[in-house]
Design a protein with these regions (language model features):
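A polyanion-binding, active-site-adjacent surface
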Residues: 40
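Serine-esterase "nucleophile elbow" of acetyl-processing enzymes
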Residues: 2-36, 79-85, 92-161, 166-174
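Alpha-helical cap/lid subdomain in secreted, periplasmic
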Residues: 21-30, 35, 43-107, 165-295
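Conserved active-site regions of diverse hydrolases
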Residues: 118, 122, 136-140, 144-150, ...
Length: 309
C-alpha cells in the first residue's frame, strides 16, 4: 500500500537539534513499523491523490484543533487544504484528532470535510510489542525502537504516583517491559519548595521505586544534570512565573539523592553520561536544544543511534 506522512500546519521534520524533531523521528519510526509498506514523507500536495493512505502527523506541541499559524496562514496551508478537499483515499490523524473544517475557518474553501479517523499509534505500538515508555515530555529522549510511547507533557512524578497503583494489574497484563521517566519537573519546580526538600525527595522516589517493583520488568531513568541558572525558558515553561526553585547546587544535591535511590533499588536504570556534568552547569547547554527549552537535542537521546540517522 502506497502511503505518505504529511502535516497540515508544518511539514514532517527531521531536525536532530530540536525537541520537535525528536518527536518526528520517534513517530516516523513507529509509523514505519506499523504500516505494511513503503512510506513517503512530505510529498507535494498536488500528488496526494496518488497515495492510498495519508497519515496526518502534526508537531509535538499540537493540541486538538488548535492551529497556530506562525506568521499567519500561508499559501502552502491553502494548497494542502485544497488537496485534502480533492483527496479520495484514507486519511488518518496520528495520535491527536484534527478537524479540517476548523482548519478551514482561516481559508473559507467551499467544501465540507468529512471526519478523519484518529489512531494513537504511539500507544498502539506498545500494545503490539508489549513494551512501553511512559513519562512526561522528556520521555522522547529515552524512547527506543520496539516500544510504544505514552507521553503526558507537564506531568510530575508526584502527580503520576497519585493513581499509579491502579495501573499495575492492567500494565502487567499488557506489557512485558516498561521504561518510566518522571521527576525532572518535580526537581525543577517543586521539591525545593517543600519544608524539608531532602526528605521530600527521598519519600517521593522511594514511592516511585515501590511502584516500579510491582511491574513485570520496569526500568527507571535517572534525572538530568541541572543546567546553569542563566538558561532562559519561554513563558509556557515557567511555574508561578519562575524558571526554577532552588539554586543549581541545591537541585543537584536532590538529583543525587533521587538517582541514588533509583540506582540502588535493584531495578534496571538508565543513566546520563557523567561527562555532561561540570562545575556550574554550562556544559549542559551543549546537549540541550538551542532555543529556550528544558529538552535535550535529539542527537543526544539515550538510544538515538538506533533510530536517528
Amino acid at each position: 500500500m502506497k502511503a505518505a506522512v504529511v502535516g497540515m500546519l508544518n511539514n514532517v521534520g527531521s531536525s536532530t537539534s530540536h525537541h520537535g524533531g525528536g518527536y518526528y523521528h520517534v513517530m516516523m519510526n513507529i509509523l514505519k513499523a506499523e504500516h505494511p509498506g513503503e512510506l513517503f514523507f512530505n510529498p507535494d500536495p498536488s500528488t496526494w491523490n496518488e497515495y492510498e493512505r495519508l497519515y496526518i502527523l502534526e508537531g509535538v506541541n499540537y493540541q486538538e484543533n488548535v492551529f497556530n499559524f506562525i506568521g499567519g496562514p500561508q499559501p502552502e496551508h491553502r494548497a494542502k487544504l485544497e488537496a485534502m478537499a480533492k483527496y479520495t483515499g484514507l486519511a488518518i490523524a496520528v495520535n491527536v484528532p484534527i478537524d479540517l473544517n476548523v482548519f478551514n475557518k482561516r481559508f473559507g474553501i467551499d467544501h465540507q470535510f468529512t471526519s478523519i479517523n484518529c489512531i494513537d499509534f504511539a500507544k498502539l505500538y506498545g500494545d503490539t510489542t508489549r513494551k512501553l515508555v511512559r513519562g512526561d515530555s522528556h520521555s522522547l529522549s529515552v524512547w527506543k525502537p520496539g516500544y510504544g510511547l505514552d507521553r503526558t507533557d507537564g506531568k510530575t512524578l508526584f502527580g503520576f504516583l497519585k493513581d499509579a497503583d491502579t495501573l499495575i494489574d492492567k500494565w502487567n497484563e499488557k506489557y512485558d517491559e516498561v521504561i518510566l521517566y518522571f521527576g525532572n519537573i518535580d526537581l525543577r519546580f517543586h521539591l525545593m519548595r517543600q519544608e524539608n526538600p531532602q526528605q521530600a525527595t527521598g519519600e517521593l522516589f522511594r514511592r516511585y521505586v515501590q511502584f516500579a517493583k510491582k511491574l513485570n520488568n520496569a526500568t527507571l531513568v535517572n534525572l538530568l544534570p541541572v543546567e546553569h541558572e542563566s538558561r532562559k525558558l519561554p513563558g509556557t515553561g515557567l511555574y508561578l512565573k519562575q524558571p526554577y526553585f532552588g539554586t543549581r547546587q541545591q537541585r543537584m544535591e536532590l538529583r543525587d539523592t533521587a538517582n541514588r535511590i533509583m540506582n540502588n533499588s535493584g531495578l534496571n536504570t538508565l543513566q546520563w553520561p557523567d561527562e555532561w556534568i561540570d562545575e556550574d552547569g554550562m556544559k549542559m547547554f551543549e546537549y540541550m536544544e538551542p532555543k529556550q527549552s528544558v529538552h535535550l537535542k535529539p542527537r543526544y537521546y539515550m538510544f538515538s543511534d538506533q533510530f536517528i540517522k
